[in-house]
Amino acid sequence: MTNAALLLGEGFTLMFLGMGFVLAFLFLLIFAIRGMSAAVNRFFPEPAPAPKAAPAAAAPVVDDFTRLKPVIAAAIHHHHRLNA
């Protein structure tokens, strides 16, 4: 085996070992973050939402078409009057 092939083999070995250690560290980091999140949620849960107060008697809801019907009629009348 030549010196270049030996160096190439050692380079691949070192590369795969480095990638393996990084992958193992990332998995460890993921599990640590999940564990800390579970611990925080267990000891400090989010408060229950406060019940909403009943709304006061509101004015009756009028849809947009009912409010705009006289405006549309006036616009049509004005258009017919100008173009007649």
Swiss-Prot record:
It catalyses: oxaloacetate + 2 Na(+)(in) + H(+) = pyruvate + 2 Na(+)(out) + CO2. InterPro entries: Na_pump_deCOase, OadG. The chain crosses the membrane at residues 13-33. It is a single-pass membrane protein. One of its GO terms (biological process) is sodium ion export across plasma membrane. It comes from the Bacteria. It holds the Pfam family OAD_gamma. Its cofactor is Na(+). It is an enzyme of class 7 (translocase). GO terms for molecular function: decarboxylation-driven active transmembrane transporter activity; oxaloacetate decarboxylase activity; sodium ion transmembrane transporter activity. It is found in: Cell membrane. Its EC number is 7.2.4.2. GO terms for cellular component: plasma membrane. Keywords: Cell membrane, Ion transport, Membrane, Sodium, Sodium transport, Translocase, Transmembrane, Transmembrane helix, Transport. Belongs to the OadG family. Catalyzes the decarboxylation of oxaloacetate coupled to Na(+) translocation. Heterotrimer of an alpha, a beta and a gamma subunit. This is Oxaloacetate decarboxylase gamma chain 2. It comes from Salmonella typhimurium (strain LT2 / SGSC1412 / ATCC 700720).
